[in-house]
């Protein structure tokens, strides 16, 4: 089992949700208006010069096949997206248990 955290600018949540739908994933936990800064990207602080924020989705995968499709789709989308700041990020971790 795997746990994935997906992070993107709030502006691009619709395209991220489209990727989930295309991969057959209809389960997630979502946090909106998340503040932060990635390596080599602009801050997303929700105010001032850095007024944007991020969205974070947490998805638990018992079956890793949809995760593989999602990763492929994110890599394709990111390759087509010029600005690194606009890329979708996926962080994958082992998941020991779902209760």
What is the predicted role of each segment?
Residues 1-99:
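Positively charged, small/polar-rich N-terminal and surface patches that mediate targeting and assembly
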């Amino acid at each position: 089992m795997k746990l994935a955290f997906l992070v993107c600018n709030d502006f691009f949540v619709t395209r991220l949700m489209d990727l989930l739908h295309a991969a057959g994933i209809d389960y997630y936990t979502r946090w909106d208006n998340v503040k932060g800064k990635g390596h080599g990207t602009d801050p997303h602080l929700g105010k001032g010069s850095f007024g944007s924020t991020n969205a974070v989705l947490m998805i638990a995968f018992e079956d890793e096949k949809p995760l593989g499709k999602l990763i492929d789709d994110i890599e394709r989308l990111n390759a087509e997206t010029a600005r690194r700041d606009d890329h979708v990020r996926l962080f994958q971790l082992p998941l020991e248990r779902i209760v």
